[in-house]
Amino acid sequence: MVPVNPALPGRSYPPTPPYLVAREKIREFASAVFATNPISFDVEAARAAGHADLVGPPTFPIVVQEYTLQQLLADPEAGIDFSRVVHGDQRFTYTRAVVAGDQLTATMTVTSVKSLGAHSMVTAESMIVDAGGEHVVTAISTLVVRGDE
């Protein structure tokens, strides 16, 4: 088994293609995560709460971040065997809510690689911006790459 490349921290990947946040995508995601807030299902409720359209649940940006993680996992120089990856941690830092109609682009940078015995922990930050280049949310994921058993 090839170990995770310890030189990954600081490596950035190209911006993802724009992702159009559609109302139905928000509704589908909200249903899948058992969200109950009406601002994710009802446009009028979202507008009454001061939003332009439906609001994605707090974890919705993972949909956009997954495109950046695909870049990392497909990078042969990363040394990450996807069959050995488990999700260790997830955090989001918001500037504003994700709303239907947003066109979001993400750029990922690997921030750390730590070895824990035979295992590795890879932390990456995905900066997610709107069509105007304004920051919306930063998604931070830690992947655990299991070593040999």
UniProtKB/Swiss-Prot annotation:
Q: Which CDD domains does the UniProt entry name for this protein?
A: R_hydratase_like
Entry's InterPro entries? FAS1-like_DH_region (IPR039569), HadA-like (IPR016709), HotDog_dom_sf (IPR029069)
This one is known as: UPF0336 protein Lxx02810
Tell me any Pfam family this protein matches: FAS1_DH_region
Q: Please give the superkingdom of this protein's source.
A: Bacteria
Task: Give the record's family classification.
Answer: Belongs to the UPF0336 family.
This protein's species is: Leifsonia xyli subsp. xyli (strain CTCB07)
